[in-house]
């Protein structure tokens, strides 16, 4: 029996596209958990909130979800700033962030879900855009635009964040705040302000990730929970605080899931993907590019 090379190549490309989306979903966690050491378990809820905002604007005004996500970036940034301020004053300042802080984000996750259920119900919602149902074909290679467009936007988002974190004073301060807050204070930078900015940026990325999610698939309020395990797994696999490592890990997880789904069925994909995670961490406990 001849090996289906064409099927494998399509699965590889689909995995890369899926990995790009996973990277956009995970980048916020990579900042809050990987750099700031804040276990924001509610991050997927903010992503779903971004999806619903994109849905409302798309249905009522016909605006493209990606454009909507860019327009609401300031809203999500200030929402993230507010959430961090509450978290800092209530838990971090008192040294209670470990358990009570985690409970705070769990509560935020479920409260957001309940509000969305009360407003929208549990029916799946989707958006309309000219490219969503379009597939580009190059010989045997299929490129669904509902995956290609999110991949391109993800890469642009990640490139912008990498530039910001490595080339600007605030970005370098964000990287430094996790390593030496005292040295940062001596540089006339307020560590709490820097952490608030970083956390706000992490929540702002959820607006874009939410728009990409609803382009790829219909959403309902609890869909975000499906991604909790994946995003933390990608963050740890890539190496804590390493944006390039996170991108590589997201691509690897996407490829493993895609190939497994293609040849063995979707039900095997999560098990094989997390098995791959465990093996990798057994070999490299610090992650792929962990420090």
Where are these regions (language model features)?
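Inter-helical junctions in multi-pass inner-membrane proteins, predominant
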Residues: 2-14, 21, 165, 169, ...
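Helix-loop-helix "hairpin" substructures at the membrane interface of multi-pass membrane proteins
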Residues: 18, 138, 142-219, 243-249
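Short loop segments and helix-boundary regions at transmembrane helix junctions
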Residues: 36-39, 60, 68, 78-123, ...
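Single transmembrane alpha-helix segments in multi-pass membrane proteins
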Residues: 7-60, 88-96, 100, 239-243
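Extracellular/periplasmic helix-loop junction at the C-terminal end of a transmembrane helix
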Residues: 110-138, 262-269, 289-291
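Cytosolic-side transmembrane-helix boundaries in multi-pass membrane proteins
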Residues: 119, 179-186, 190-193, 263-291
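Interfacial loop-to-helix junctions that mark the boundaries of transmembrane helices
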Residues: 5-14, 61-67, 96, 137-151, ...
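Glycine-rich helix-loop "coupling/hinge" segments at transmembrane-helix boundaries
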Residues: 43-46, 216-244, 249, 269, ...
